[in-house]
Amino acid sequence: MDLAKIEKFIDKQKVSFICSIDDEAYPNVKAMLKPRKRIGLKEFYFSTNTSSMRTKQYLNNPNASIYFYHKGLFRYIGVMLKGTMEVLTDQESKDMIWKKGDTIYYKNGVTDPDYCVLKFKAMSGRYYCNLNTENFEIK
């Protein structure tokens, strides 16, 4: 499996899907903008509201997955990563992924208490392309 190819694929996507587990043990999926920061295939950083349902779910159960896909005319490519999601509220993490214009979502700026960072740590993945799938480990 060419992990560098998967990284390039992920970087081209504008949307990602994150999955959390609710208090009844059911998966919940949400479309998000692409990650704000990525370190290899191991770490992904997203911004979200501290008050969101998803944040509460990750605090209760950190098991998570993220998914990226592209649908072309004749083929579909998808990458699922499994791991854990951590909710970060420290200022250093918030500063790290803050973007100009984020005040549209977080009125009080980078120090807004309703702004937090989701840090996804991947353990394994599954790649799909042309009716073929391949599992891979992330070290």
Where are these regions (language model features)?
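Charged, amphipathic alpha-helical segments
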Residues: 1-4, 48-54, 99-104
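A short, Trp-centered hydrophobic/proline-enriched beta-strand micro-motif
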Residues: 8-24, 64-68
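Short, surface-exposed beta-edge/turn micro-motifs
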Residues: 13-15, 42-44, 61-64, 113-115, ...
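Short glycine-rich loop/turn motifs
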Residues: 15, 29-32
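A short, aromatic/hydrophobic, helix- or strand-capping loop or linear motif
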Residues: 20-22, 69-70, 107-113
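Residue-level signal for well-ordered, solvent-exposed loop/turn and beta-edge residues enriched
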Residues: 26-28, 84
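A short mixed-secondary-structure module that forms the rim of ligand-binding clefts
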Residues: 35-73
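Charged, gly/pro-rich active-site loop segments
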Residues: 79-139
